[in-house]
């Protein structure tokens, strides 16, 4: 199956820690679990029009949740921390968030 750039990037991560990393031009996203670093780099560069220096990824297991007697599990996910080059502009989506 061929992925589009919008299939690879699921959503941004908006936390206090990720907002602090923005000063170093590091942005955090939840990405498709099957995406590799080169796919993530290409998707970020195409969608936001920036130049990516490095991509660091981490895979997480979904938490087990229980409602009454029923036991379920949240889905597994992958988080990508993308560092932009010094010459690159900032990602406009994050500019208004502080």
UniProtKB/Swiss-Prot annotation:
PROSITE patterns: RIBOSOMAL_L23. One of its GO terms (cellular component) is ribosome. InterPro entries: Nucleotide-bd_a/b_plait_sf, Ribosomal_uL23-like, Ribosomal_uL23/eL15/eS24_sf, Ribosomal_uL23_CS. Belongs to the universal ribosomal protein uL23 family. PANTHER family: 60S RIBOSOMAL PROTEIN L23A. Part of the 50S ribosomal subunit. Contacts protein L29, and trigger factor when it is bound to the ribosome. This is Large ribosomal subunit protein uL23. It comes from Clostridium kluyveri (strain ATCC 8527 / DSM 555 / NBRC 12016 / NCIMB 10680 / K1).
């Amino acid at each position: 199956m061929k992925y589009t750039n919008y299939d690879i990037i699921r959503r941004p991560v908006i936390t206090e820690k990720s907002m602090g990393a923005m000063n170093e031009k590091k942005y955090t996203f939840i990405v498709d679990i099957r995406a590799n670093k080169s796919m993530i780099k290409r998707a970020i560069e195409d969608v936001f029009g920036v130049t990516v220096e490095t991509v660091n990824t981490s895979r997480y297991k979904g938490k087990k949740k229980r409602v009454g007697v029923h036991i379920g599990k949240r889905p597994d996910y992958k988080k990508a921390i993308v560092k932009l080059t010094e010459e690159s502009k900032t990602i406009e989506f994050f500019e208004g968030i502080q």
